[in-house]
């Protein structure tokens, strides 16, 4: 914890420097960052699960407490109004005392409505509000111009791509937790459990509730693995278990892990061989990644690797790998991007920003679902998650195309029973190497 405290001190110093620059560029004196508010379910007396503002948890590892407010000006110690009411209906977070609390001035907020008077001397013309409730900001006294100003957010989001040492430690810890869950889920799969029960096994192993994980776990067997964001969780195991895809993460101090593995129920069939080769291609792709190259290039490179696999397994025949990629024959098999930035959010911000003024570079027209077009630089954290699926809705147009004769539709029909493959690691870009946080922890 001592090391974490030291790294957190450096982290706050970095955030203060970024804030100073963002404020100076935009003629603001300070930022007021709101943790968020509970959202009521329509015509009910309950709330949706609370999800904290990522801009807030960038500063303090407070992820489950609404109605908190953070004042930062880049120079003085940040002020944190921490909401901790007297409440016998609900559990309440006490004022924290931890490795990070000496870096902020803690102010007890006993009633959420008291924030208006508490902030009366702070809300001035040159203060910006960052948060999810423009209406609350207006009630406090913010003008429309000062609510979530785009130029401020663009600057902060762009620089959030470069993780501090504290953030990298937190992300490595999230990896450890997620991997414990993945190993437990694999054991549950081997024991013949259902998707629902495998998910329970994962949550128990990680110590997460289903509202704590950074995204809804994807636990998919057989054809369900062809649904990219499958979250239905069948309660009964299939009578014939053929394959298992798990895409599940964990969170540590607000930072996410996002890991995917695919398994064949039998080790001696063609699908198992395809998984093994896909795993090799994913690792080979990572070995080519280096500073100064646009992320888009690795997405395109992976399409060439997918073409090689399609040809090797006779899924697509009598056409060169180059033509497969040029004509888009690989796209129905690999319809999503190679990955995305990772951090405080699973799909972290600024994937398309080319500079800190927010210059946008969209994904190529041919690959519209790619989530990052940045040039890779040290301290960036990204996922590498190639996929190879057998999705009828994407394959159907090719049945009637001029290239239909090159597809082995009988083989595709057989492989559709397995759904698909996705293999995902989380990597850190360093000056002279790529750190694979996932593989470094020995997840096969």
Curated annotation (Swiss-Prot):
One of its GO terms (cellular component) is cytosol. Mn(2+) 1 binds at residues 258, 340, 385, 424. One of its GO terms (molecular function) is phosphoric triester hydrolase activity. It catalyses: Xaa-L-Pro dipeptide + H2O = an L-alpha-amino acid + L-proline. Pfam families: PepQ_N, Peptidase_M24. InterPro entries: Creatin/AminoP/Spt16_N, Creatinase/aminopeptidase-like, PepQ_N, Pept_M24, Peptidase_M24B_aminopep-P_CS, X-Pro_dipept-like, X_Pro_dipept. One of its GO terms (biological process) is proteolysis. Its cofactor is Mn(2+). CDD domains: Prolidase. Binds 2 manganese ions per subunit. Its EC number is 3.4.13.9. It is an enzyme of class 3 (hydrolase). Mn(2+) 2 binds at residues 247, 258, 424. SUPFAM superfamilies: Creatinase/aminopeptidase. Transmembrane segments: none annotated. Keywords: Dipeptidase, Hydrolase, Manganese, Metal-binding, Metalloprotease, Protease. Splits dipeptides with a prolyl residue in the C-terminal position. Belongs to the peptidase M24B family. Bacterial-type prolidase subfamily. This is Xaa-Pro dipeptidase. The lineage of its organism: Bacteria, Pseudomonadati, Pseudomonadota, Gammaproteobacteria, Enterobacterales.
């Amino acid at each position: 914890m001592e090391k974490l405290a030291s790294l957190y001190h450096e982290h706050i110093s970095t955030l203060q420097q970024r804030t100073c620059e963002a404020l100076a560029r935009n003629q603001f004196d300070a930022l007021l960052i709101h943790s968020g508010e509970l959202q009521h379910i329509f015509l009910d007396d309950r709330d949706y699960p609370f999800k904290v503002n990522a801009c807030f948890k960038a500063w303090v590892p407070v992820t489950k407490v609404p109605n908190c407010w953070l004042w930062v000006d880049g120079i003085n110690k940040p002020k944190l109004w921490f909401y901790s009411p007297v409440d016998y209906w609900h559990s309440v977070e006490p004022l924290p005392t931890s490795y990070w609390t000496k870096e902020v001035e803690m102010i007890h907020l006993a009633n959420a409505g008291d924030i208006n008077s508490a902030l009366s001397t702070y809300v001035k013309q040159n203060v910006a509000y960052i948060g999810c409730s423009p209406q609350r900001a207006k009630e406090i006294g913010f003008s429309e111009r000062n609510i979530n100003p785009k130029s401020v957010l663009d600057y902060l989001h762009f620089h959030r791509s470069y993780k501090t040492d504290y953030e990298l430690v937190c992300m490595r810890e999230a990896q450890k937790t997620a991997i414990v869950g993945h190993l437990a889920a694999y054991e549950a799969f081997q024991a013949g459990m259902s998707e629902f029960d495998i998910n329970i096994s994962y949550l128990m192993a990680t110590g997460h509730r289903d509202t704590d994980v950074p995204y809804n776990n994807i636990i998919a067997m057989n054809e369900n693995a062809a649904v990219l964001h499958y979250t239905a969780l069948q309660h009964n195991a299939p009578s014939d278990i053929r394959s298992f895809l798990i895409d599940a993460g964990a969170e540590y101090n607000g930072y996410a892990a996002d890991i995917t593995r695919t398994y064949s129920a039998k080790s001696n069939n063609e699908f198992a061989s395809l998984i093994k080769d896909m795993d090799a291609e994913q690792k080979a792709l990572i070995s080519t990644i280096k500073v100064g190259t646009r992320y888009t290039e690795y997405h395109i490179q992976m399409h060439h690797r997918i073409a090689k696999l399609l040809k090797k397994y006779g899924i697509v025949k009598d056409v060169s790998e180059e033509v497969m990629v040029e004509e888009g024959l690989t796209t129905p098999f690999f319809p999503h991007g190679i990955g995305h930035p990772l951090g405080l959010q699973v799909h972290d911000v600024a994937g398309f920003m080319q500079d800190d003024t927010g210059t946008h570079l969209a994904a190529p027209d041919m690959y519209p679902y790619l989530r990052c077009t940045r040039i890779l630089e040290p301290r960036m954290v990204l996922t590498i998650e190639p996929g190879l699926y057998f999705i009828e809705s994407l394959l159907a147009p090719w049945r009637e195309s001029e290239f239909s004769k090159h597809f082995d539709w009988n083989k595709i029909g057989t492989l559709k029973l397995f759904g698909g493959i996705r293999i995902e690691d989380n990597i850190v870009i360093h000056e002279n190497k790529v750190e694979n946080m996932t593989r470094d922890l020995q997840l096969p």
